Amino acid sequence: MISLNDITLRNVNINDSDRLIKWRNSECIRKKMINAHIVQKEEHENWLRSVLNNSNAQWFIVNYKETAVGAMYITDISKKDKTSTWGMYVDRRYMGSVVGVLMEVIAIDKMVFDL
């Protein structure tokens, strides 16, 4: 059984580029994106560099027992207005499992208590 204690977060870094683009371009995730085109490597790398330098965004790799199972992001962070936007990518192997629900719980916790 998967529990919240088995889920950890770490900040995304440039070395996560290949993993993130693979998840982002997978059909099950891509078709749910506002911008549903297949992202090319150069476009993705430029985007990732800008994300990593954006103080109004936080991106995390979500691990389940040391295995990367998805990414979670909180963007458009306004400390003044206490608002933000969030989303996640879940590795296909974990879709339909409790991992997505736990990611939602963690995201809400971070937005309410850490921003």
PLM features: what roles do these ranges have?
Residues 37, 42-93:
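Acetyl-CoA-dependent GNAT
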Residues 97-110:
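Conserved acetyl-CoA-binding loop-helix of GNAT-fold acetyltransferases
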Residues 19, 85, 89, 102:
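Amphipathic alpha-helical recognition patches that constitute DNA-binding helices
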Residues 1-14:
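Conserved N-terminal entry element of GNAT/NAT acetyltransferase domains
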Residues 22-36:
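Helix-loop element at the rim of GNAT/NAT acetyltransferase active sites that forms part
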Residues 113-115:
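Conserved GNAT acetyl-CoA-binding A-motif
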Residues 24, 44, 104-107:
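Polar/charged side chains located within well-ordered beta-strands of beta-rich proteins
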